């Protein structure tokens, strides 16, 4: 390693160091939280390598199965879930996982553990074969029922405002980890030369306004009229449209630079497409801790009580001023 790079790495806290320091500053954070976040970060390194290897082996292929949301699964969706399940079980802090790629709750062998993780193992996996960004989303809940008993619906069907922490990994030109607790939002960048994440974006705050919006324009004619009116407003304001097809990537841009992401209901999907528990709650928690807003058009995302773990909702998230302007169009 060049000497200058070594000096830089030594002067910036690693994820491990920062989690320890944050635990010391805020003793109310359960000791399990940094352990779980560290396990997610470790798994992300392996997943990044698996994605690269799949490209080299030209094995970016789909399975013959659909997940519960009706999306065709790629092999890497299943591989990623396996990595995370193994890592989370090894923490001894997680009793169960709910995943976009699993039909129902996945119990782990840690019967005495008090925490449940909601997980989207590989967001935007259809982007892999064209080398576009992909991501992972996760959040942490505390179970309600007693330890050593089967997981109950009440343990998982709870509003997102009860999340203890939430985060995502973005696999792109550099690999990034962002996580949030009630004490703030922080971003880390992966340095492959030392195999660690380093704090590069401390105490993130989402700008109150922005100049970009993200929406799939190909469905514009199927959106409700109020969304069509809002898009017309964005165009009159000469806002820039940026849409990658990977939720994590689009949100990350808006977290850093300001903007709004929209996934409205359509004729074919009147209840929306994005999963409340695996995608919307995760990013809504991060956005609100960073000063942004997230809504389904009627109520804050974090207030919604899920009916089932794979529930879908309309989703609007981003800079506070832009989301409020959208809600004015909804009326």
Curated annotation (Swiss-Prot):
<dbReference type="Pfam" id="PF00316">
    <property type="entry name" value="FBPase"/>
</dbReference>
<feature type="binding site">
    <location>
        <begin position="123"/>
        <end position="126"/>
    </location>
    <ligand>
        <name>substrate</name>
    </ligand>
</feature>
<comment type="similarity">
    <text>Belongs to the FBPase class 1 family.</text>
</comment>
<comment type="subunit">
    <text>Homotetramer.</text>
</comment>
<feature type="binding site">
    <location>
        <position position="123"/>
    </location>
    <ligand>
        <name>Mg(2+) 2</name>
    </ligand>
</feature>
<feature type="binding site">
    <location>
        <position position="243"/>
    </location>
    <ligand>
        <name>substrate</name>
    </ligand>
</feature>
<comment type="pathway">
    <text>Carbohydrate biosynthesis; gluconeogenesis.</text>
</comment>
<feature type="binding site">
    <location>
        <position position="120"/>
    </location>
    <ligand>
        <name>Mg(2+) 1</name>
    </ligand>
</feature>
<keyword id="KW-0460">Magnesium</keyword>
<dbReference type="GO" id="GO:0030388">
    <property type="term" value="P:fructose 1,6-bisphosphate metabolic process"/>
</dbReference>
<dbReference type="GO" id="GO:0000287">
    <property type="term" value="F:magnesium ion binding"/>
</dbReference>
<keyword id="KW-0479">Metal-binding</keyword>
<dbReference type="GO" id="GO:0005829">
    <property type="term" value="C:cytosol"/>
</dbReference>
<feature type="binding site">
    <location>
        <position position="273"/>
    </location>
    <ligand>
        <name>substrate</name>
    </ligand>
</feature>
<feature type="binding site">
    <location>
        <position position="122"/>
    </location>
    <ligand>
        <name>Mg(2+) 1</name>
    </ligand>
</feature>
<dbReference type="Pfam" id="PF18913">
    <property type="entry name" value="FBPase_C"/>
</dbReference>
<dbReference type="InterPro" id="IPR000146">
    <property type="entry name" value="FBPase_class-1"/>
</dbReference>
<feature type="binding site">
    <location>
        <position position="279"/>
    </location>
    <ligand>
        <name>Mg(2+) 2</name>
    </ligand>
</feature>
<keyword id="KW-0378">Hydrolase</keyword>
<dbReference type="GO" id="GO:0006094">
    <property type="term" value="P:gluconeogenesis"/>
</dbReference>
<feature type="binding site">
    <location>
        <position position="100"/>
    </location>
    <ligand>
        <name>Mg(2+) 1</name>
    </ligand>
</feature>
<dbReference type="GO" id="GO:0042132">
    <property type="term" value="F:fructose 1,6-bisphosphate 1-phosphatase activity"/>
</dbReference>
<dbReference type="InterPro" id="IPR028343">
    <property type="entry name" value="FBPtase"/>
</dbReference>
<keyword id="KW-0963">Cytoplasm</keyword>
<feature type="binding site">
    <location>
        <begin position="261"/>
        <end position="263"/>
    </location>
    <ligand>
        <name>substrate</name>
    </ligand>
</feature>
<protein>
    <recommendedName>
        <fullName>Fructose-1,6-bisphosphatase class 1</fullName>
        <ecNumber>3.1.3.11</ecNumber>
    </recommendedName>
</protein>
<feature type="binding site">
    <location>
        <position position="216"/>
    </location>
    <ligand>
        <name>substrate</name>
    </ligand>
</feature>
<dbReference type="InterPro" id="IPR044015">
    <property type="entry name" value="FBPase_C_dom"/>
</dbReference>
<keyword id="KW-0119">Carbohydrate metabolism</keyword>
<dbReference type="GO" id="GO:0005986">
    <property type="term" value="P:sucrose biosynthetic process"/>
</dbReference>
<feature type="binding site">
    <location>
        <position position="120"/>
    </location>
    <ligand>
        <name>Mg(2+) 2</name>
    </ligand>
</feature>
<dbReference type="GO" id="GO:0006002">
    <property type="term" value="P:fructose 6-phosphate metabolic process"/>
</dbReference>
<dbReference type="GO" id="GO:0006000">
    <property type="term" value="P:fructose metabolic process"/>
</dbReference>
<dbReference type="InterPro" id="IPR033391">
    <property type="entry name" value="FBPase_N"/>
</dbReference>
């Amino acid at each position: 390693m060049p000497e200058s790079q070594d000096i830089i790495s030594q002067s910036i806290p690693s994820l491990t160091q920062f989690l320890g320091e944050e635990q010391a500053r805020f003793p109310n954070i359960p000791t399990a939280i940094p352990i779980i976040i560290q396990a997610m970060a470790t798994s992300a390194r392996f997943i990044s390598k698996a994605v690269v290897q799949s490209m080299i082996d030209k094995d970016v292929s789909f399975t013959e199965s659909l997940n519960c949301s009706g999306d065709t699964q790629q092999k890497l969706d299943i591989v990623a879930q396996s990595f995370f399940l193994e890592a989370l079980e090894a923490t001894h802090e997680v009793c169960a996982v709910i995943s976009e790629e699993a039909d129902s709750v996945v119990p782990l062998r840690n019967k005495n553990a008090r925490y449940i993780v909601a997980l989207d193992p590989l967001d935007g996996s259809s982007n892999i074969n064209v080398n576009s960004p992909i991501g992972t989303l996760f959040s942490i809940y505390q179970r309600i029922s007693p330890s050593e008993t089967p997981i109950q619906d009440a343990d998982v069907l709870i509003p997102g405002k009860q999340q203890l922490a939430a985060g995502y990994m973005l696999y792109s030109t550099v690999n990034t980890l962002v996580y949030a607790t009630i004490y703030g939002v922080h971003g880390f960048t992966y340095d492959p030369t030392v195999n660690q994440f380093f704090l590069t974006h401390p105490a993130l705050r989402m700008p109150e306004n922005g100049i970009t919006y993200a929406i799939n324009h190909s469905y514009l004619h199927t959106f409700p009229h109020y969304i069509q009116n809002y898009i017309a407003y964005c165009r009159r304001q000469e806002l820039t449209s940026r849409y990658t097809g990977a939720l994590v990537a689009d949100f990350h841009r808006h977290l850093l630079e300001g903007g709004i992401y929209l996934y409205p209901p359509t004729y074919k999907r009147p209840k929306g497409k994005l999963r409340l528990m695996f995608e919307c709650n995760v990013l809504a928690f991060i956005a609100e801790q960073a000063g942004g807003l997230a809504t389904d058009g009627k109520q804050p995302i974090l207030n919604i009580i899920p009916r089932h773990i794979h529930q879908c909702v309309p989703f609007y998230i981003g800079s506070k001023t832009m989301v409020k302007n959208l809600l004015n169009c909804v009326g």
